[in-house]
């Protein structure tokens, strides 16, 4: 297996201060072709990445492939979750990295790490990820915030990007590596973000909130009532 590229022997992990997020071609039409994961999960994961990038003040760049055609518009949740996101219109290029304005926007962030997700995985995520590695970036590909037309296509693409030096991750791992600690003022917002990725986590949040309320309000336990 190939080693992660451009890390110079260092541990390949996300540095929030040196990272930019590229959310590529998360479009309503393309989402209808996704078969390797539930569309609702893909949509939630992509939106969660945008939310966490906003919390961590990570630059976000979005783009779409011929959005006036059958590929459809970007899903609106991404820019709603990341109002600071910059949209770059392409001129038909399939690989976003072939668009000079897109690459210029990435370079303008001054960041050396790129967190990339895109639909479809084998094209919209893989092509720019491999190209960015070639240009010297440290690239993290978020596989479960990217979707494609078959499980086989996902597996082949994962092997290809790893061979090229890309670091594959899932959404929860990306969020955790960005968050780093629960000892931060926005910890509650991060917890809410996780609940969108794995909804059962919301049950833990609710149980904890109730337990805290019992303590803080000096509620009498049912077992103590006469």
Residue ranges, per PLM feature:
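Distinct, well-ordered alpha-helical segments
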Residues: 71-78, 102-103, 128-130
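A contiguous pocket-lining binding segment that forms or flanks enzyme active sites
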Residues: 113-171
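Well-ordered alpha-helical segments embedded in enzymatic catalytic cores
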Residues: 45-48, 101, 124-127
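Short phosphate-binding loop-to-helix
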Residues: 91-104
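Active-site acidic carboxylates
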Residues: 2-92, 108, 138, 155-162, ...
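Glycine-rich phosphate-binding loop signature in dinucleotide/nucleotide-binding domains
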Residues: 106-112
